[in-house]
A protein has these predicted regions:
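Short, acidic, metal-binding catalytic loop of nucleotide-sugar glycosyltransferases
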Residues: 294-305
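Long helical/loop segments within the catalytic core of UDP-sugar-dependent glycosyltransferases
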Residues: 253, 331-355, 367-454, 465-466, ...
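N-terminal membrane-anchoring/stem segments of glycan-assembly enzymes
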Residues: 2-271, 523, 533-537, 660-689, ...
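Cell-envelope/extracellular polymer assembly enzymes that use nucleotide-activated donors
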Residues: 274-276, 307, 459
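Membrane-embedded multi-pass helical conduit in multi-pass membrane proteins
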Residues: 174-178, 182-238, 530-615, 631-692
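Structured alpha-helical
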Residues: 8, 12-16, 629-874
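The conserved acidic donor/metal-binding loop of glycosyltransferases
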Residues: 360-364
């Protein structure tokens, strides 16, 4: 290259071109690409006046105008990319000039929309102010109970007749479209309204559309003339009916969350009851259990009214010695029947307290746990059980493997943030096995913890409700623990839950038997139905293949009618759930959670339906490590099989599109869209199965807590603790950090009005941020440290409200990215022969995408006079 340039060009130009060539090579360009880049540069110098100020502005704004083209590393077809992007820039610049008045009108519409949102936000307060003085006039207290029931009956009857007409009235396509447009308009009007009225309105609209869809499916969409189409259609209809039942029951369950608040305890402590704290353990490491015991020792409750018990089903001498050392009770069984339930029932024979609080051995209670929960027991004598959330300070496999910890609500947030609160409204709160208090008298009446199923907790609460006792739920986290360490452990835990809930459905069905109210029966039914989602989810993941591979019409209707019924059903359900559940479950994430579990919970739930006594209790492992990032090929095998099946459907769909009957084109397109959506969801499931590296034994907790450090020379510096673990802390010194790595300092933390000192060593100094490692602590110091950190009353309270607002379209985009990420991981960890194919496909897709024009960055102003862009800026 240099010899040729010296022969053709004058020395200064040749030297400059040689420098450019070497620069291209240093940035990774191939010799051919670098030489071709130099050639395009020469042509640009010849054809365009690059020294003109206009071209200089383009050159200076190259990164903004051509964000997908790396000028320092040219590719052979970059001129084509420059040309396509330049034409795109000219088009959007011209469109902007041509439609400027229209954009201004859009701005005015946006302003009107903002005013509408502001008006909606203030509507409840204005209504309250205008109606306060009319409250007495509107009272119906003068009416008899019979008159009230009559009025209510008339309203309900009229509403049911109207709903029946709306659901069953047949429409032609145009009428159906207008009807849906009206409902959609109402939904958009009310969705911004704060308060529960808008949620109720959205539920009514969603139920109207969904019930109408189900009616249409049963009456108009089954092909009775083709056996294959009929069978496939009935299978899909079964799955859709299941989803519709869960949707209706779910709306009922959370229509009016109670949001129970604490009740103050009597000022006279002599009136406070005695409480036993049970910490059952089987094979967990002692280090996992220690923090729970240390925190329990610091619970704010009279010491003569509090007894702490370690229930060791492993019979380990180290646990016995630890219990004796810290002054708590220890119980070990000689036999181990009925697992955790049997362990607790055995301890009930020894404990004599009026109440029993139960914590899993990794759940660390806060100091305020009993003061927050016990007031309700003294107020309501029929209250048998108070449940609080299961909060985790460590990411579960979904959060860790996807990097979504504290960015997206986790799988359990919906249940503990909303569903249990909704259950509380209907007096149907479930006992969840930990972080709960139970009154001994009713527990003894039902024979202790239920042992007939592997979900002994929910079965116990069902028995208490059958006896006429009540339950309660408080949505304020009062304990925190460890999540499952791996996806396989997580799935194993969910399999046990699913099997247990189906066992209850078979052995003690809440729909039958005495003692339950209708609302309680429905709440329990929905909880059990939730774990039957495996088979319906697998049906949804394979349903479009029935048409693409077997030519079976699973929905026997024109594609236009399918769109007019299916899309509104899905959109209204998504919009309503986003409004109700947005703080606790972002849109489309349920698809990922259910897909990951579907294959694994389908067989055990089916077996439990047939033989409810089959199956055993499995202990969920906690406190493990993941030393290297890897794909769990065993877990991901079903997802990959479903991916291949859907790819086969894509191939069949492409063939049908080009060679099938013309009147099936729209049906093929709809089926392919469904398949591509399934592929995205399955890609997300694959992404979850890639276990991220986790080698930290002491899990860090983010927090903002005041503290101070004291040097050995007596100098004291205030600081803020921004994270802590059982082995150290991260702090930010308020001012310049005057400490050195390796230096020993004392950390000062407060609990209430008392200050505690902990010996530490500086292990890292970055500006004013300092990493501290705890020096060996005495037992007393360790107890104090846990109570100053993990057991603080305010440590977990704000976590559940820190998630961003759900935005369905943004959430859908996240799911799309997640799906592609899963396929990238397959390429990364696949065997070499498969990896070559993946890399080739990825490179081909990336090469095609590189020609797609991009919108310029905001800092690049496109001037009308600059419409002729340079093909090269060198």
């Amino acid at each position: 290259m240099s010899a040729l340039s010296r022969w053709l060009l004058i020395p200064p130009v040749s030297a400059r071109l040689s420098e450019r060539y070497q620069g291209y090579r240093r940035h990774g360009a191939s010799p051919f690409s670098a030489a071709l880049g130099c050639l395009w540069t020469i042509l640009a110098w010849i054809v365009f006046p690059l020294e003109h100020p206009r071209w200089q502005r383009i050159r200076d704004g190259h990164k903004a105008l051509y964000p997908h083209i790396n000028a320092a590393r040219p590719r052979p077809l970059d001129p084509a990319r420059y040309l396509i992007q330049t034409l795109w820039l000219v088009m959007i610049s011209s469109a902007k000039e041509r439609h400027e008045p229209r954009w201004r009108s859009f701005a005015r519409l946006k302003d009107v929309r903002g005013r509408y949102h502001q008006w909606m936000d203030t509507l409840p307060e204005r209504v309250r102010q205008k109606t306060t003085h009319l409250e007495k006039e509107k009272e119906l207290g003068h009416l008899s109970n019979g008159a009230r029931r009559f009025i209510l009956g008339v309203i309900v009857t009229f509403s049911l007749i109207l709903a029946l007409i709306c659901i069953t009235q047949p429409f032609n396509p145009l009428s159906q479209f207008i009807f849906l447009l009206l409902l959609w308009g109402v939904a958009l009007l009310v969705r911004r309204m704060p308060g529960r009225f808008s949620a109720l309105m959205l539920i009514v609209l969603s139920l109207t559309v969904s019930c109408r869809y189900i009616w249409w499916r049963y009456t108009s969409t089954l092909n009775w003339d083709d056996p294959v189409s009929l069978v496939c259609g009935l299978i899909l209809l079964f799955a859709e009916t299941y989803a519709w039942i869960v949707l209706v029951l779910g709306y009922f369950q959370v229509v009016w969350p109670l949001n129970r608040q604490p009740v103050p305890l009597p000022k006279e402590m002599s009136q406070w009851p005695t409480v036993d704290i049970f910490v059952p353990t089987y094979n967990e490491d002692l280090n996992v259990v220690k923090n729970t015991i240390y925190a329990s020792l610091g619970i704010d409750w009279p010491k003569d009214k509090l007894n702490i018990w370690i229930l060791d089903d492993g019979g380990r001498e180290s646990f016995r010695q630890f219990a004796r050392h810290v002054g708590v009770h220890y119980i070990a069984r000689t036999t181990h029947e009925h697992a955790k339930a049997g362990n607790i029932n055995n301890a009930l024979k020894h404990a004599k307290g009026e109440f029993v609080a139960i914590f899993d051995c990794d759940h660390v209670p806060t100091r305020s746990f009993l003061q927050m929960t016990m007031g309700w027991f003294l107020k309501e004598k029929q209250l048998a059980m108070m449940q609080t959330p299961h909060h985790f300070f460590f990411p579960d496999p979904f959060e860790r493997n996807l990097g979504r910890f504290r960015k997206t609500p986790n799988e359990g947030t919906l249940f503990y943030g909303l569903v249990q609160d909704g259950n509380d409204m209907w007096d149907a709160t479930f006992f969840c096995g930990s972080c709960a208090v139970i009154r001994r008298k009713p527990l003894d009446e039902i024979g202790g913890i239920a042992v007939e199923t592997v979900t002994e907790d929910a079965h116990t609460s069902l028995r208490l409700h059958r006896r006429g006792y009540t339950s309660a739920y408080m949505r304020i986290p009062q304990a925190a623990g460890l999540a499952t360490e791996s996806l396989s452990a997580h799935i194993g835990q969910r399999i046990r839950w699913a099997r247990g809930m189906v066992q209850i459905f078979r052995l003690d069905n809440p729909l039958f038997g005495k003692g339950l109210k209708l609302a309680q029966r429905l709440c329990y039914l929905n909880a059990m139905f939730h774990f039957l989602s495996g088979i319906p989810r697998l049906i949804f993941l394979t349903a479009p293949l029935a048409f693409l591979l077997l030519h079976a019409y699973i929905i026997y209707a024109p594609a236009l009618m399918i769109a007019l019924f299916v899309i509104p059903h899905m959109v209204h359900a998504s919009l309503t759930n986003s409004k109700i559940q947005g703080k606790y479950r972002h849109s489309f994430w349920s698809e990922i959670y259910e897909t990951v579990l579907a294959w694994y919970i389908a067989p055990p739930t089916l077996v439990a339906l047939i033989n409810p006594h089959k199956g055993k209790f499995n202990v969920t492992a906690k406190g493990g490590l993941v030393e290297e990032k890897y794909v769990d090929w065993v877990i991901s095998r079903p997802y990959i099989f479903l991916v291949l099946l859907n790819l086969l459907g894509v191939a069949a769909g492409v063939w049908r599109y080009y060679y099938g009957p013309e009147n099936e084109t729209l049906t093929v397109i709809v089926s392919l869209v469904w398949v591509f959506y399934n592929l995205v969801i399955l890609g997300g499931a694959v992404a979850v199965s890639v276990e991220s590296k986790q080698v930290r034994r002491a899990h860090r907790v983010e927090i903002a807590m005041p503290g101070a450090i004291a040097r050995e020379d007596g100098h004291l510096f205030s600081c803020t603790v921004h994270d802590f673990s059982d082995g150290g802390l991260g702090i930010k010194i308020n001012g310049q950090a005057q400490v050195l790595e390796g230096q020993k300092v004392n950390l000062l933390l407060k609990r209430g009005q008392q200050e505690y000192v902990f010996p530490t060593q500086v292990v890292r100094v970055t500006g004013n941020e300092v990493g501290l490692q705890l020096m060996p602590l005495t037992t007393k110091q360790h107890i104090d440290f846990v109570q100053c950190t993990f057991a603080r009353a305010d440590t977990w309270a704000l976590w559940q409200d820190s998630f961003p607002e759900d935005k369905p379209l943004e959430s859908l985009l996240d799911i799309l990215k997640l799906g592609f990420r899963g396929y990238r991981h397959l390429a990364e960890f696949a065997p070499p022969s498969v990896k070559v194919i993946f890399r080739s496909l990825t490179a081909l897709i990336a090469w095609i995408v590189s020609f797609i024009p991009r919108r310029p960055e905001r800092q690049a102003a496109i001037q009308p006079s600059d419409r002729v862009m340079a093909q090269a800026q060198q």
